[in-house]
Amino acid sequence: IEDACLRHRYLRSDFLDFVEGNPGFLRTVADVVDPAERTYWLFSLCRYAAERYQMGVSTVGSEETLCLDENFHHYGAHVLFETSLDPDPADLAAYFEMAPTPEVLVHVDAPGDRCLTRQRDRGDDGSALPQAEHAVDEFSSPLEAQEKYRRACSLVAEYLGRVTSVVRVENTGTVEECTAEVE
């Protein structure tokens, strides 16, 4: 319980520090998630990104590299998936301009059927994506939803390739093979 209380306190403090340094964050996130049905969930993802980013920049040493998994740009793909039938990262230009730009963005991709199999193997039933507001009418299967999400992720990587280096990894091999691609 003590760890949970301390973690909550530090994360809250990190979030407030991030917002203080990025005063447009709250308005921008509220604007981009507004069209979605699951606005609280999307806002929570963006808050999580801000907390982890701020915690990282405030603790990383001068000789260290801050490496974040599932952060602002990853969550931008979630926002695109949830808010648009035809995802276009330019629709989130204000969001991507507000988000800290990484020196390198690693875009990891795998075929949709492999992603769903991995989700199921981890105990996830793969239903997170098909629960999007428009998913009931739009998708005939979880694979169709997964493919749309893959496309949103690829579009975000392509969009950000204009302002930063993007490393693309085809995640079809072993962990060692995929790691070697990044190195």
What is each model feature region?
Residues 44-51, 87-88, 141-152:
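Soluble or luminal CAZymes and related metallo-dependent hydrolases
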Residues 1-83:
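ATP-dependent small-molecule kinase phosphotransfer cores
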Residues 120-183:
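NTP-dependent small-molecule kinase module
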Residues 54-57, 94-97, 156-157:
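Short, flexible, glycine/charge-rich loop motifs used to bind or transfer phosphoryl groups or to couple energy/partner
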Residues 64, 70-71, 91, 98-122:
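Conserved phosphate-donor/acceptor-positioning beta-strand/loop module used by diverse small-molecule
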Residues 58-62, 98-100, 161:
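Flexible, charged surface loops at secondary-structure boundaries
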Residues 74-77, 114-117, 176-178:
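Short catalytic/ligand-binding loop motif for oxyanion handling, primarily in non-cytosolic enzymes
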Residues 81-95:
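Substrate-gripping "pore-loop 1 plus following alpha2 helix"
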